[in-house]
Amino acid sequence: PGYIKGYPPGVRENGGQYTHAGLWMAMAMARKGDGERAVQLLRMLNPIEHARDAESVWHYGVEPYVMAADVYRLPGRIGQGGWSWYTGAASWMYRAWVEEVLGLQVRNGRMLLNPVIPVTWQGFSLSYRHGETVYAIQVENPDGCERGVVWVEMDGQRVTGDVISLERGLVKHRVVVRMG
C-alpha cells in the first residue's frame, strides 16, 4: 500500500537505509542512555564514511559531503546513495549529535546540559552562542560514564540542577559539566 510499494525491495523506505529512520533510532538510543550505540549509528549514517577512498566515493555515487535520504540494499546497487539534497535528514543528524549525544538543548531561554556519550569519551568541549553571549562548555567524564550529570558550574559557581538560564550581553561564560 502507498508509494513504498512502487519501490523495488532494497530501495529507499522499502528495505534500504532510510536515513530519517536511522537517525531517529540513534536519537532513541541516546534517550535511553546508550551513548555507545547512538554514536555507532550516527557514524554509520555519516556520508563521509562512504568516502574513505576513491573507489568508495565512486561506488556511493552521490556527494559524500551531503546527507543522502537513503542508501540502497538492492542487489547490484548495494551501498549506493540516493536522494541527496532532497532530504531533511541533515537537520536530524545535527539535532541527534548536538541535542541527544552532546546533550545541549536550548528551550525557552534555558540551556539544558545532559550528555549521553560512549564510555571511552573522557569528555569534550563545545561553544554555544546566544545573541552576543558565548558559553564555552567543557564536559568532563573522568569515570567513563555514558550518562549522568553530577554537577554543572558556570564561571566557577555551582548551578542548581543541570539547567542554565541564558542571558544576552557581550560576555563569555565558562561552563563545566561533570559527568558521573
Question: PLM ranges: what are they?
Answer:
Residues 1-3:
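Glycine-rich phosphate/pyrophosphate-binding loop
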Residues 6-17, 23-180:
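Non-catalytic C-terminal accessory modules of carbohydrate-active enzymes
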